[in-house]
């Protein structure tokens, strides 16, 4: 344990004593609530709300509120919160991460802080990893809250904005991390206040907090629209790389020459093309220099094609179903339908597999969900079965302390030491022998594998031995809950990819609810089609199932409980602990063991040679395992290396995103003020003054008044607004040209532009002007922000090369990002003023109001003939349009690795806005280009 971790744990005892004290306080008043009627219990909610409004704090209300929820849960669910669950609830309310072992009832714990914090009326968000858990928890735990008079909502995919607004309006809202994050982004792309769905970020309880805040922290949420051009060279390069051969890196100091056309580093998941490979590619493509700037996109195609060939394996990283490449979550083995890798990687895999290649997308809005979205909450807490291994990270990045909550009953699971074999074949043979032996006596077994491929290989070996079993992987994900629920039955053998079924308890003897449902379905009943018959038959079926489960539970308990067998160590100790944690819930007996081989990914990438030497020295045959402390230490060392590597990556992502986050706060704050109806008159006057100052500064920064090109300056003014004051008038007022100073020009032109603004308002009318101003500002702001994200993307992609010039890439990114942001702000001011004066506006009379479409978003500034708002027509600034496709990119559910994408439902699409100018460049853009900032790069 590191010194930092020891320091972190030093205060644990003090916190636990505090939690114990409060839990005892709740138990001491429990009897006062038992004799209350349902109506009296429900009335307490209003009483607590009044007391909170009168100045009592939530901490003051905590003991009574928790006792109220405990009694309500007893009456509604038949479940009473244990004292340790009370401790967990207090930890969550105080803003800690509560580590609670599997089966300790984390879902029930969430009801306590949710109820207490909902009393403030500001809303509580309970965040889970998938829609299934969000719906299940909101329905089941929602009964307790509804019984106590609180409203409960649930956010799931494909809801309309109106439905989402209603769910967010509830006292307590359940949903997934991605849904909450995307709603925040879409709120900041909204075109009117009516489209906003979220009402603030008060308090969040994150379930499986390690998965959401750690595993997925490297992956940002991205909303994107179609790119201007689809990738054209992907298919050609997929064919081309089949003619290239993999080799090894050279070392000039050791006199080792590089071999092959390219090298692959599996540990870092990178590829590098050798000189020989470059020469071949140049020859085949008929080009002189692959690395010329004009050929930059080709390098990207080539690297992606090699990665697709070497690093992305079919039936492990992805599967091909019905001509479509589908990503497989590396942790759960689930298919992530509709999701796509970004940066052209998915297209490269599609080209490799010979299926249709779909277009790439362009970023419209982005945020790192974990590191910046969750920091929006006034108070954040979380719960998981495995958090202590990442306690330092929770503290350093999120300022969250971790508290290990004691188990309700002592843990009696036996964790056996690892067995290591020389080859994978020998390992799996031993695994099959072990399973067959345990299966013969009837002990339930859960086998964890790391990929679809390995789960199917093991399944074949078990079938050859005649062992009946269930396979749970990406290809059987639709039966997941049923298989997992019955994995604790006598004689059950379940082969699962990693952590599939997280959130579903494996109960010894089986799950009576699922047994009863299966029995009724066998009789031909359906809960949707035969509602009345189902309701009538359910109680009897449930009673029969409960009796059967009770008898089987005792049998399975005597056999030793659930045996968890891991076929490979994961790169994170936490994932291994999660697999082990499936067994030994609530004091049940259980056993776990990991089988390893030198061919396993972790062993191959780290320390395998040392272990091989140990086994060779000991002269160990292939089929004989070793249990060696040195090997166990080597595995622990390899895991900590990977964990540290991943931690550094996450910290690095945060540093870079922090730059963008500050810019995002400025832009989103500005948008929110516009949407909420702030009077823009004063702001637009500032825009005018700043733009005039900028124009004059660019023209008069050098030389004397006689050398200034005032005709060119006035030409720019005329493009901006209908300028009335002339150069001759200024000369006359100043006496001669020498008296015309920059300050004098600025004062005269500002007075003139303000007069023209008032004249424009008199022509159109104040009401119409007030309605058009937010449209002008929002349309320009959105397009400029989108272009800025685009450029920041490319800046970050190439910034690492600055290290070769002895410069800190992060400092360079901050400096250049700041310059780009300032240029964008200047462009926003300039274009907003230009729209104000140059847009043609027609007012149609006898129309009372402008209807706002539900789900309508930003305007299109180019498509004429689009459906116009009935009251005001502004040429080039028409009613909001929806593009055909709008995409999202998010972290994999339950996973750590992939960046994945999919389509939003059309009614949630957000319109695209484009420049109304001929070349799309403002003077601010042009000035930046002259300074060497370059134009906007087009993403290929």
From Swiss-Prot:
Its EC number is 7.4.2.8. Residues 851-940 are annotated as: Disordered. Residues 928-940 have a biased composition (Basic residues). It is a peripheral membrane protein. Induction: No mRNA is detectable in stationary phase cells; the protein is subject to protein degradation in stationary phase. GO terms for biological process: intracellular protein transmembrane transport; protein import; protein targeting; protein transport by the Sec complex. It is an enzyme of class 7 (translocase). Keywords: ATP-binding, Cell membrane, Cytoplasm, Membrane, Nucleotide-binding, Protein transport, Translocase, Translocation, Transport. PROSITE patterns: SECA, SECA_MOTOR_DEAD. It is found in: Cell membrane; Cytoplasm. The keyword Heme does not apply. It catalyses: ATP + H2O + cellular proteinSide 1 = ADP + phosphate + cellular proteinSide 2. Belongs to the SecA family. Part of the Sec protein translocase complex. Interacts with the SecYEG preprotein conducting channel. Has a central role in coupling the hydrolysis of ATP to the transfer of proteins into and across the cell membrane, serving as an ATP-driven molecular motor driving the stepwise translocation of polypeptide chains across the membrane. Monomer and homodimer. Part of the essential Sec protein translocation apparatus which comprises SecA, SecYEG and auxiliary proteins SecDF. Other proteins may also be involved. This is Protein translocase subunit SecA. It comes from Streptomyces griseus. The lineage of its organism: Bacteria, Bacillati, Actinomycetota, Actinomycetes, Kitasatosporales.
């Amino acid at each position: 344990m590191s010194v930092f971790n020891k320091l972190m744990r030093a205060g644990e005892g003090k916190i636990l004593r505090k939690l114990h004290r409060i839990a005892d306080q709740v138990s001491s008043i429990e009897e006062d609530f038992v004799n209350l009627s349902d109506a009296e219990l429900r009335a307490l909610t209003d009483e607590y709300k009044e007391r909170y409004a009168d100045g009592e704090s939530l901490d003051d209300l905590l003991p009574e509120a928790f006792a109220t929820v405990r009694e309500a849960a007893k009456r509604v669910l038949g479940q009473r919160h244990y004292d340790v669950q009370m401790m967990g609830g207090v930890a969550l309310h105080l803003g800690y991460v509560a580590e609670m072992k599997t089966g300790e009832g984390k879902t029930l714990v969430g009801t306590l802080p949710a109820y207490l914090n909902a009393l403030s009326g500001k809303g509580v968000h309970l965040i889970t990893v998938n829609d299934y858990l969000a719906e299940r928890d909101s329905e089941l735990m929602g009964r307790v809250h509804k019984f106590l008079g609180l409203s409960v909502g649930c956010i799931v995919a494909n809801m309309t904005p109106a439905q989402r607004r209603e769910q967010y309006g509830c006292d307590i809202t359940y949903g997934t991390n991605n849904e909450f994050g995307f709603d925040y982004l879409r709120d900041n792309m909204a075109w009117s206040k009516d489209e906003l769905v979220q009402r603030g970020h008060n308090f969040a309880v994150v379930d499986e907090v390690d998965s959401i805040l750690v595993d997925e922290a490297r992956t940002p949420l991205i909303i994107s629209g179609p790119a201007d051009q689809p990738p054209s060279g992907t298919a050609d390069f997929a064919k081309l790389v089949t003619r290239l051969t993999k080799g090894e890196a050279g070392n000039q100091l050791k006199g080792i020459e590089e071999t092959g056309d390219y090298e692959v580093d599996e540990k870092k998941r990178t590829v590098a093309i050798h000189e020989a490979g470059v020469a071949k590619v140049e020859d085949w493509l008929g080009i002189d220099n692959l690395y010329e700037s004009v050929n930059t996109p080709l390098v990207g195609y080539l690297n992606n094609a090699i990665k697709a060939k070497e690093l992305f394996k079919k039936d492990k990283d992805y599967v091909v179903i019905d001509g479509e490449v589908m990503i497989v979550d590396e942790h759960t083995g689930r298919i992530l339908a509709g999701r796509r890798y970004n940066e052209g990687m998915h297209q490269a895999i599609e080209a490799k597999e010979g299926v249709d290649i779909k277009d790439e997308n362009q970023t419209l809005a982005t945020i790192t969900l974990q590191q910046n979205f969750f920091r929006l909450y006034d108070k954040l807490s979380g719960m998981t079965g495995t958090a202590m291994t990442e306690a330092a990270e929770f503290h350093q990045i999120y300022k969250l302390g971790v508290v290990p909550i004691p188990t309700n009953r002592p843990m009696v699971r036996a964790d056996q030491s690892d067995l290591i074999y020389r080859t994978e074949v020998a390992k799996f043979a031993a695994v099959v022998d072990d399973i067959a032996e345990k299966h013969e006596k009837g002990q339930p077994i859960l086998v964890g594998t790391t990929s679809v491929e390995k789960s199917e290989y093991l399944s074949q070996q078990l079938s050859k031995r005649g062992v009946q079993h269930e396979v749970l992987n990406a290809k059987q994900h639709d039966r997941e809950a049923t298989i997992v629920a019955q994995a604790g039955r006598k004689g059950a053998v379940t082969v699962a990819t990693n952590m599939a079924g997280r959130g579903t308890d494996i109960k010894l003897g089986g799950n009576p609810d699922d047994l009863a449902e299966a029995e009724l379905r066998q009789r031909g009943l359906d809960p949707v089609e035969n509602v009345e018959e189902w309701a009538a038959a359910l109680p009897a079926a449930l009673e029969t199932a409960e009796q059967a489960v009770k008898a089987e539970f005792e049998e399975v308990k005597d056999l030793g409980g659930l045996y968890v067998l891991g076929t490979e160590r994961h790169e994170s100790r936490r994932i291994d602990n999660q697999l082990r944690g499936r067994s030994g819930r609530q004091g049940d007996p259980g056993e776990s063991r990991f089988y390893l081989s030198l061919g396993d990914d972790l062993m191959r990438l780290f320390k395998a040679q040392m272990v091989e030497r140990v086994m060779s020295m000991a002269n160990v045959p292939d089929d004989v395992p070793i249990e060696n402390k040195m090997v166990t230490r080597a595995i622990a060392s390899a895991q900590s290396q990977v964990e540290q590597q991943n931690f550094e990556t996450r910290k690095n992502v945060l540093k870079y995103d922090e730059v963008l986050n500050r810019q995002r706060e400025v832009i989103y704050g500005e948008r929110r003020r516009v949407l909420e109806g702030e009077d823009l008159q004063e702001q637009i006057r500032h825009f005018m003054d700043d733009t005039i100052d900028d124009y004059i500064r660019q023209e008069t920064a050098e030389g004397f008044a006689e050398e200034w090109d005032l005709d060119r300056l006035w030409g720019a003014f005329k493009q901006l607004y209908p300028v009335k004051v002339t150069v001759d008038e200024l000369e006359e007022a100043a006496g001669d040209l020498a008296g015309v100073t920059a300050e004098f020009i600025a004062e005269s032109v500002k007075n003139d532009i303000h007069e023209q603004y008032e004249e424009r308002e008199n022509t159109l009318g104040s009401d119409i002007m007030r309605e058009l101003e937010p449209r002008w500002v929002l349309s320009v702001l959105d397009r400029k922000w989108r272009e800025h994200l685009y450029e920041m993307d490319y800046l970050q992609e190439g910034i690492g090369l600055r290290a070769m010039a002895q410069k800190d890439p992060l400092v360079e990114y901050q400096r250049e990002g700041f310059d780009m942001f300032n240029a964008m702000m200047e462009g926003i001011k300039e274009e907003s003023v230009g729209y104000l004066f140059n847009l043609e506006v027609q007012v149609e009379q006898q129309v009372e109001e402008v209807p706002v479409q539900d789900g309508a978003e930003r305007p299109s500034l180019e498509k004429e003939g689009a459906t116009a708002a009935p009251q005001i027509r502004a040429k080039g600034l028409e009613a909001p349009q929806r593009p055909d496709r709008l995409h999202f990119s998010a972290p994999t559910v339950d996973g750590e690795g992939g960046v994945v994408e999919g389509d939003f439902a059309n009614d949630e699409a957000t319109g695209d806005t484009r420049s109304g100018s001929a070349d799309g460049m403002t003077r601010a853009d042009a000035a930046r280009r002259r300074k060497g900032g370059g134009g906007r790069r087009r993403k290929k």
